[in-house]
């Protein structure tokens, strides 16, 4: 089953959106297989944002993601990577459609509530940065037979 990595960023945690976001993905029919509230270290932030190390905004990314706790999650389901991206909305909240997480709650590009993997490859890499294999729980949900 396809997996993706999602993270409620420090602004989303401080604004009490964890429950709302989890509920949206559960109601969609996706399965939460790993989750933790954590403080991102500069080392983890550097790994997570490795593709941006040479960009002028890299320092701001690291400063923000380490500024407070995040809620890291692994979700699984059919088409979860692409569907999660659609549910999050465009990166710039003012361009995100109403009904999406960023469209409903995002304020600025920097403080846009949530991060989600943009591909299966990114999901695998990001899951490996934030979770150990034994932290992910593989279980059957009775409702899956009604969804898939």
Curated annotation (Swiss-Prot):
Q: Where does ATP bind?
A: 9, 57, 85, 91, 102, 112
Tell me where in or outside the cell this protein is found: Cytoplasm
InterPro entries, A to Z: NDK-like_dom, NDK-like_dom_sf, Nucleoside_diP_kinase, Nucleoside_diP_kinase_AS
Q: Enumerate the Gene3D superfamilies for this protein.
A: Nucleoside diphosphate kinase-like domain
Q: What is this protein for, i.e. what is its function?
A: Major role in the synthesis of nucleoside triphosphates other than ATP. The ATP gamma phosphate is transferred to the NDP beta phosphate via a ping-pong mechanism, using a phosphorylated active-site intermediate.
Look up the record and report any one GO term of the cellular component aspect. Answer: cytoplasm
Q: What is this protein called?
A: Nucleoside diphosphate kinase
Q: Which GO terms describe its molecular function?
A: ATP binding; metal ion binding; nucleoside diphosphate kinase activity
User: What does it catalyze?
Assistant: a 2'-deoxyribonucleoside 5'-diphosphate + ATP = a 2'-deoxyribonucleoside 5'-triphosphate + ADP; a ribonucleoside 5'-diphosphate + ATP = a ribonucleoside 5'-triphosphate + ADP
User: What EC number(s) has UniProt assigned to this enzyme?
Assistant: 2.7.4.6
Phylogenetic lineage: Bacteria, Bacillati, Bacillota, Bacilli, Bacillales
Instruction: State its cofactor.
Output: Mg(2+)
Catalytic site positions: 115 (pros-phosphohistidine intermediate)
Known partners and oligomeric status: Homotetramer.
One record GO biological process: UTP biosynthetic process
In its keyword annotation, does this UniProt entry include ATP-binding? yes
Iron recorded as keyword: no
Which family is it part of? Answer: Belongs to the NDK family.
Gene name in the database record: ndk
């Amino acid at each position: 089953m396809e997996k993706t990595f999602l993270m409620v960023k420090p602004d989303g945690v401080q604004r009490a959106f964890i429950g709302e976001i989890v509920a949206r993905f559960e109601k969609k029919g996706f399965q939460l297989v790993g989750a933790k509230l954590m403080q991102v270290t500069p080392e983890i932030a550097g790994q997570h944002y490795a593709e941006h190390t040479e960009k002028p905004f890299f320092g701001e990314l690291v400063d923000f993601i380490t500024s407070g706790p995040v809620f890291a999650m692994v979700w699984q389901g059919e088409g979860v990577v692409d569907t999660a991206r659609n549910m999050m909305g465009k990166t710039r909240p003012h361009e995100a459609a109403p009904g999406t997480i960023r469209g409903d709650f995002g304020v600025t590009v920097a403080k846009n509530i949530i991060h989600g993997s943009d591909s299966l490859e990114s999901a695998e890499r990001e899951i490996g940065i934030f979770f150990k294999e034994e932290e992910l729980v593989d279980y059957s949900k009775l409702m899956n037979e009604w969804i898939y």
